[in-house]
Amino acid sequence: MSKKAVVLLSGGLDSATVLAIARHQGYDVYCLSLDYQQRHRAELQAADRVTKALGAVMHRTVKLDLSVFGGSALTDASIAVPEVPSEGIPVTYVPARNTIMLSLALAWAEVLEARDIFIGVNALDYSGYPDCRGEYVHAFQAMANLATKSAVEGRTIAIHAPLIDMTKADIVTQGTSLGVDYSLTVSCYQADDEGRACGVCDSCRLRRQGFVAAGLADPTRYAPTAGIR
């Protein structure tokens, strides 16, 4: 019997790498994306490209409009995306986003009878988001194994965060070795409709630094007006 895994896929660099890792580990991969009315909607088209390139069994996108709550520069157009690193948790944090996404992945995993969920959170080269830490992942896994029919009946769920302790350079190096085409991905928080990056947001900065540190060419497509810092 094949082993199934649900992979959370944003369409960015990290989640594409996680998809490649899951495939390399022999999983039949079912990708789940969330259309939460994010500012950088080009990442949803990127997710489609990545799933096709890396051979996912299925890709589903769930629509859940988090802009009705706002509270983040990624869901509220009145909040500007910062161009320089800030102190504390940045305004690009989307309240409870990873918890929502993992909950949806958990529901689908139960239906698929899959015991494994992959997420691309990273605790080193990240922006300070509280739901990108190892203790958060462990806590969600503990909750999942208390709250699901499958776990109660003996089919426990494992939450895999293979990038959690990796630098961005480590991530792009491993992904490249696994055949990830990063030109298909979109990381920018304010990418234009064609998926071209701004070059100045925190996500662009971390992505670019990763390729430089890894000694790899940066395949990111930048908008004509992009500022590279």
Curated annotation (Swiss-Prot):
A GO BP entry: queuosine biosynthetic process
The protein's Enzyme Commission number: 6.3.4.20
The keyword ATP-binding is assigned to this record: yes
Reaction(s) catalysed (UniProt annotation): 7-carboxy-7-deazaguanine + NH4(+) + ATP = 7-cyano-7-deazaguanine + ADP + phosphate + H2O + H(+)
UniProt KW Hydrolase keyword: no
The entry's keywords: ATP-binding, Ligase, Metal-binding, Nucleotide-binding, Queuosine biosynthesis, Zinc
Enzyme type, top EC level: ligase
Co-factor(s): Zn(2+)
Ligand binding (Zn(2+)): C188, C198, C201, C204
GO function term, MF aspect, one: ATP binding
UniProt pathway annotation: Purine metabolism; 7-cyano-7-deazaguanine biosynthesis
Note describing how the cofactor binds: Binds 1 zinc ion per subunit.
InterPro entries membership: QueC, Rossmann-like_a/b/a_fold
Binding site for ATP: L9, S10, G11, G12, L13, D14, S15, A16, T17, V18, L19
Record-stated family: Belongs to the QueC family.
Summary of the function given for this chain in its UniProt record: Catalyzes the ATP-dependent conversion of 7-carboxy-7-deazaguanine (CDG) to 7-cyano-7-deazaguanine (preQ(0)).
PANTHER family for the chain: 7-CYANO-7-DEAZAGUANINE SYNTHASE
The name this protein goes by in its record: 7-cyano-7-deazaguanine synthase
UniProt source species: Methylobacillus flagellatus (strain ATCC 51484 / DSM 6875 / VKM B-1610 / KT)
Gene: queC
